[in-house]
Curated annotation (Swiss-Prot):
The physiological role of BioH is to remove the methyl group introduced by BioC when the pimeloyl moiety is complete. It allows to synthesize pimeloyl-ACP via the fatty acid synthetic pathway through the hydrolysis of the ester bonds of pimeloyl-ACP esters. InterPro entries: AB_hydrolase_1 (IPR000073), AB_hydrolase_fold (IPR029058), BioH (IPR010076), Carboxylesterase_BioH (IPR050228). It comes from the Bacteria. This is Pimeloyl-[acyl-carrier protein] methyl ester esterase. The gene is bioH. GO terms for cellular component: cytoplasm. GO terms for biological process: biotin biosynthetic process. The active site is at residues 78, 203, 233. It comes from Xylella fastidiosa (strain Temecula1 / ATCC 700964). Pathway: Cofactor biosynthesis; biotin biosynthesis. Belongs to the AB hydrolase superfamily. Carboxylesterase BioH family. Monomer. The keyword Transmembrane does not apply.
Length: 255
């Protein structure tokens, strides 16, 4: 599995969200590259890894990334957070975990109210078969909905998406299956690495309340929460400076 490497300094692995690729992190990469060695992952079926044989499944992807990277902090955005959290819960080489607009459980459950209804993801999976492009555009609009810079962010996401090979329908449906059926809440209870959780105040896909609820499950003495005022589901597009400062401070304090 191909992983782009850039920069110099302490290692940081970045894993993107549904339908995108690692190019989405460009605003962060520009600022972090002078201070960190960045390992930019395109998930299987996405971007530069659109033909990789690695399946889009947590254990296989995490193993492939771990085999190609040194001890590092792992950052996961949205869907990418499931891979980062799984790695943090199972691999000793994960020095720290950054969950960016991501939670251990993306869909609403009886004991997990601050999340999207699973029917929304099911509908996206069905719509992909009928109209791929329209469905992707609708999801990108949800990524930016609520943000104070929604229109600008939407234009950025559309441009970024088309800069590399777009995932096929089967890959996207596999990602939706992960979002709909993965529940890693139990992994938080005994989480060993320190963690930073970043929420967009206006995020409509992963409400800030769900991220706050996740931090309660993790060890309190090793868990930090940052809420980006005015941020949506992709706060690194509109608040790159604030995000970069928070990431660097967190990484600098790791043992």
């Amino acid at each position: 599995m191909y992983i782009e490497v850039t920069g110099y300094g302490p290692a940081l692995v970045l894993i993107h969200g549904w339908a995108m690729h690692s190019g989405v992190f460009a605003p962060l990469v520009e600022q972090l590259r002078p201070h960190h060695t960045l390992y930019l992952v395109d998930l299987p079926g996405h971007g530069y890894n659109h033909t990789t044989p690695t399946p889009l499944a947590l254990p296989q992807v995490v193993h492939a990334i771990a085999a190609a990277t040194p001890p590092a902090v792992w950052l996961g955005w949205s869907l990418g957070g499931l891979f980062a959290l799984h790695a943090a819960a199972t691999l000793p080489q994960v020095r720290g975990l950054i969950m960016l607009a991501a939670t251990p459980c993306f869909v609403r459950r009886e004991d997990w109210p601050h999340a999207v209804e699973v029917s929304i993801l099911t509908q996206f999976a069905q719509d992909l078969k009928q109209n791929y492009t329209e469905t992707i555009n609708r999801f990108l609009a949800l990524d930016t909905l609520g943000s104070t810079h929604a229109q600008s962010e939407l234009r950025q996401l559309r441009k970024i998406l088309n800069a590399r090979h777009t995932p096929n329908t089967a890959t996207l449906q596999a990602g939706l299956e992960l979002l709909a059926h993965t529940d890693l809440r139990r992994a938080l209870i005994d989480l060993t690495p320190p963690s930073l959780w970043i929420a967009g105040q206006r995020d409509r896909l992963v409400p800030a309340a769900s991220i706050q609820a996740a931090t309660v499950l993790a060890p309190s003495d090793q868990t930090e929460l940052l809420t980006i005022t005015g941020g949506g589901h992709a706060p690194f597009l509109s608040h790159a400076n604030q995000m970069t400062a928070a990431l660097q401070h967190f990484i600098a304090t790791l043992p």
